[in-house]
Design a protein with these regions (language model features):
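Beta-propeller blade termini and top-face loops
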Residues: 1-403
């Protein structure tokens, strides 16, 4: 339980269901209410479980989770994996790479050829080459490298350091969110085929020596399919040639080796709403801002996404519903004058960056007046002029504005 990616959800240890997920019971004796990043079951003994948790800890259970023993400290460990044919060998990675050769009783850090000074390392194995281990490492500036071991993790060598497969562009570019979105997977039938995920998805057919972008987070581009940004999970089906991807937008799958991707998220009630703006003049009209899934206009039972990215503060003019307001992160406020058909930025003259969720309010008695909170309080007394904000405070760093 908990959220391993953003660290926003508290954890309550490991829970277990014995009736196919209908009911759940805590199994965290000896572990407590920790955020659990990953739980693995020994493929040869279902009573043995290995869990990575917050606090850089690895726990082991020999009684199907009834009790847990703290076995090792592994720096910011998030990923763990069993050797495909030898369950005595377990790999763990976070900001370092660690290995157990005694079924998780203890772990030793591997320093030969492994990355150092990075924000995060993810790992992958494949039964096609059971002694191979892949690593992908990155920091805030981009990809550190893709690495491979061919001797069960005893040492690693660099496969590539370019392009920046953690960047925002289909060519790599700059930047990275390795602390947040980082994943790697190796094909179970061909260990030379690997997929990596950061903002976009990338693929290699030569063991990571060369990488090709296989999805783009904005829109289809040059034969590259669109997949929602921020990749967190990649899993291969053992029964078909499908690969499944979990990201900030939901679940996607590809059945043609990553060329095309289908969104499977329909029906999943997973949207996290930051803010809602409700019309005072039109029944069932609202505008909603979602974490990771943009801003949508709701008319009764239909929801139409109008602004991408992360949707934040929302509002509708109290006297004229043609005027709607949405926002992206850090204070990028947008306005529609045509009932949500299109939006334009309105805060071009504000010289400050706002908070992640930047607050703003419309005056209920004068819909032409908007107050917005950045480092200072800014006011626009004539919303028909898009860049007519005036600063009216001195370094207050506003987080909330109340009517």
């Amino acid at each position: 339980t908990g959220d391993r990616d953003g660290g926003d959800s508290p954890g309550y240890g490991v829970w277990r269901s014995t009736d196919g997920g209908i009911s759940w019971h805590a199994r965290n004796s000896g572990m407590g209410n920790r955020t659990v990043y990953e739980v693995l079951m020994d493929p040869t003994n279902s009573n043995i479980l290995i869990a990575s948790t917050n606090g850089s800890r690895i726990y082991r259970s020999t009684d199907a989770g009834a009790s847990w023993t703290y076995t090792s400290t592994a720096s910011s460990c998030k990923d763990i994996a069993f050797h495909p044919t030898d369950s005595n060998i377990i790999y763990a990675s976070g900001t370092s790479v660690n290995r157990s050769t005694n079924n998780g009783v203890s772990f030793t850090q591997i320093n030969s050829g492994t990355p150092t000074g990075v924000q995060r390392i993810a790992l992958a194995v494949s039964p096609d080459e059971p002694n191979w281990v892949y690593l992908i490492a990155g920091d805030g500036s981009g990809l550190d490298g893709i690495y491979r071991s061919t001797n069960s993790g005893a040492n690693f060598s660099t496969r590539t350091t370019t392009p920046n497969v953690l960047g925002y562009d289909t060519t790599g570019g700059t930047g990275s969110q390795a602390w947040y979105d980082l994943v790697i997977a190796a094909d179970p039938t061909d260990a030379n085929v690997i997929y990596t995920g950061g903002v976009n998805l990338w693929k290699s057919v030569d063991g990571g020596a060369t990488m090709t972008c296989t999805s783009y987070w904005v829109s289809p581009q040059g034969g590259i399919d669109v997949v929602h940004a921020d990749q967190h999970a990649l899993e291969f089906s053992l029964h078909t040639n499908a690969i499944y991807n979990g990201n900030d937008g939901g679940v996607y799958t590809s059945s043609d080796n990553g060329v095309n991707w289908d969104d499977l998220s329909s029906g999943l009630a997973i949207a996290q709403i930051y803010k809602i703006g409700v019309s005072q003049t039109v029944s069932d009209l609202a505008i909603n801002g979602y974490q990771d899934n943009g801003t949508s206009v709701s008319r009764g039972t239909s929801f139409i996404t109008e602004i991408g990215g992360d949707g934040m503060e929302c509002a509708i003019d109290p006297t004229d519903a043609n005027y709607m307001y949405g926002a992206l992160y850090y204070g990028d406020i947008r306005r529609s004058t045509n009932n949500g058909a299109s939006f334009s930025a309105i805060n071009g003259n504000i010289s400050e960056e706002g908070g992640w969720v930047t607050p703003y309010k419309l005056d209920p008695n004068n819909a032409n007046r908007m107050v917005a909170g950045f480092d200072n309080i800014w006011i626009n007394n004539n919303s028909s002029i898009l860049t007519h904000f005036l600063k009216i405070s001195n370094k207050t760093f506003v987080r909330n504005i109340h009517d």
